Amino acid sequence: MSLLSVYASPLDVRRAAHLLRRATFGASPERIREFVGLTAEAAAQRLLANTAAPPPPLDPTTRQTFVNLPFSNAEQGRWQNYVKGWWVARMQQAESAAIEKMTAFWQNHFVVSFA
């Protein structure tokens, strides 16, 4: 027996906007309209559907990834800045915003760093 009933009503504008405020970093009116009429389950599936691994961050000077390079104290600060910029760009993409918001939550929860 579940403690909560499944919310089966279609989302209206207010509920769709609330969901997207909570699950992403904000949404445009167009994005909110995409979720109006969906059930909560369908909306959650849409938010989490884009789970393919993103391309790794690139060094803007060489346009090559540095992910598999040996660790370098001299380069660490520069690489951290590239990763931060790459991550912010991922957060701004509507397709991946829910995944990145969850990543931000867990990154803060487990207090991880570049290491």
Regions found by a protein language model. Give the residues of each.
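Flexible, low-complexity segments enriched for small/polar residues
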Residues: 2-13, 17-29
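N-terminal accessory alpha/beta regions
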Residues: 15, 27-115
